[in-house]
């Protein structure tokens, strides 16, 4: 193949996997990815610090990247399952997913939302409309 892979694919990375927050400040890692022409897509997840979240939002607004929001860390980290047999447990997962949708919507109108359950990616994505 003589052409760059970007001719055929939109190469992306999962920010919180390739740049774990324990080792890399979230704003620094997002800036690095935004400035790298190799990437055309980026998956982010919950950013607990509101100041950092605002800085990341501004960077993503100015970037060339297609952005996805991964809700799986929000669920898996707390042991939540939207298909749990107990209604109270399903409600907890639903509340967490609702918070994830709200944060994804805040991060920008073009952000897509993904979540993963039991190791299987749920087909498709949920496009977050602009509010």
Residue ranges of each PLM-predicted region?
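Active-site mouth loops of central-metabolism enzymes
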Residues: 8-26, 80-94, 128-131
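Glycine-/proline-rich flexible loop or hinge segments
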Residues: 37-42, 77-86
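Short glycine-enriched loops at secondary-structure junctions
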Residues: 16-20, 69-74, 117-118
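Short, surface-exposed, polar/charged, turn-prone segments marking secondary-structure boundaries
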Residues: 42-44, 70-73, 95-99
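Conserved beta-strand positions
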Residues: 13, 42-44, 114
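Acidic (Asp/Glu)-rich catalytic clusters
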Residues: 2-8, 27-37, 49-74, 101-108
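Active-site acidic/histidine proton-transfer and metal-coordination neighborhood
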Residues: 2-3, 83-131
């Amino acid at each position: 193949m003589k052409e760059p892979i970007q001719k055929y694919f939109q190469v992306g990375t999962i920010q919180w996997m390739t740049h774990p927050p324990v080792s890399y400040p979230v704003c620094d890692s997002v800036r690095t990815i935004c400035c790298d022409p190799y990437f055309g897509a980026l998956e982010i997840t919950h950013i607990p610090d509101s100041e950092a979240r605002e800085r990341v939002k501004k960077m993503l607004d100015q970037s060339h990247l297609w952005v996805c929001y991964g809700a799986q860390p929000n669920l898996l980290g707390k042991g939540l399952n939207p298909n749990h047999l107990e209604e109270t447990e399903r409600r907890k997962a639903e509340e967490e997913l609702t918070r994830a949708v709200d944060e994804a919507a805040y991060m920008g109108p073009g952000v897509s939302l993904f979540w993963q359950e039991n190791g299987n990616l749920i087909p498709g994505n949920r496009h977050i409309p602009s509010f």
